Structures are given as C-alpha cells and as structure tokens.
A protein has these predicted regions:
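Short, polar/acidic, helix-capping and beta-turn segments at strand->helix junctions
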Residues: 41
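Bacterial N-terminal signal peptides
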Residues: 1-9
C-alpha cells in the first residue's frame, strides 16, 4: 500500500516541475475543501436563503459554481460539458452536482503537465482555463461566506473548531 502511494506521488511529481501548476493546484485543492464543507455545513432549509431579493439563493449559488466548474474543467479536458446543477433544488442533489464538478476538475488537474499546460482550448491555455476556474470558485466562495455569516454560521475557511 505504501509503495503504491509513493509511486503515485512520484508519478505526480514526474508530470510537472512547474511551480505555477503546483501552486495553482494547491489553491484549487483549498477552495475545493472550502466549497465541499460549505455545501455540507449549510442546513437544507437555508439553501433557499437570499441575503437580498435580487441575488441568488444559497442553492442557486452552489449550482452556479458546480455548472461553471463542469464547463471549464471539461473544456480543459478537451470536451466541453454543460452542467445540470441549475435544474436542482434539494441539498442532496446540489451536493451531488458539486461533487460531480469536482470529479471533472480533479481529472483536469490530473491531466495537466508541463508539456500540455500551454495547449490552447478555445481562447485560453489548458492551465489558464483551470486558473480562471480557481479564481471564479474563490470569488463565489467569498460571496458564500456572507450567507453563512447572515445565518450565524462560521464559514469553513474561518472555522477554527477543528472541523475539516
């Protein structure tokens, strides 16, 4: 088991020595954790909460993130897919859609190497597409933190209670 784990780490390191790829992937992993924990932590009754009438509900914000990730990460993999999270309303369905989008993004990140990072997919490089997705996810998570605070819940990124 240990040998297989070490082989996987060595394989990952063999794919890229580019610090930009490694650092951006680390940022992706971080926001993935925050968003996953946020989706789980928000009570289902608050998925319909809107801080003001003209902005998205918490559930719609989560759907927007999942659909954006599906679109961008599948594009980086070479075959753009449209997400279906916007058609979902229950917490379970939205959490599942978010998980599916992360599976697509994990595959996209696993596919990035020094050799293919600058290959163009549409108007951006593969790496540029993934960087844009990380930027968008962080921006949307920032909005999401406000929903948590307005409901009296500590957002995952600032929760120091040890919950991971």
């Amino acid at each position: 088991m240990l040998a297989a784990s070490l082989a996987g780490v060595c394989s990952l390191r063999a794919q890229t020595t580019n610090p930009l790829i490694a650092e951006t992937r680390q940022a992706y992993t971080s926001v993935k954790g925050y968003l996953t924990r946020a989706a789980a932590a928000m009570p289902e009754e608050n998925y319909s909460f809107k801080p003001t009438p003209e902005i998205r509900t918490f559930g719609a914000l989560l759907a927007h993130i999942a659909d954006h990730q599906m679109r961008y990460c599948s594009t980086a993999l070479g075959a753009r897919k449209e997400g279906t999270a916007a058609t979902k309303t229950t917490k379970a369905d939205l959490v599942a859609a978010l998980a599916a989008s992360f599976a697509e993004c994990d595959a996209a990140w696993d596919s990035i190497t020094d050799a293919n990072a600058t290959e163009m997919v549409g108007q951006r490089s593969k790496l540029g597409t993934l960087i844009l997705d990380v930027m968008h996810s962080n921006e949307e998570y920032g909005y999401m933190a406000i929903y948590f605070r307005l409901k009296g819940i500590v957002p995952p990124s600032t929760d120091r209670s040890g919950a991971k």
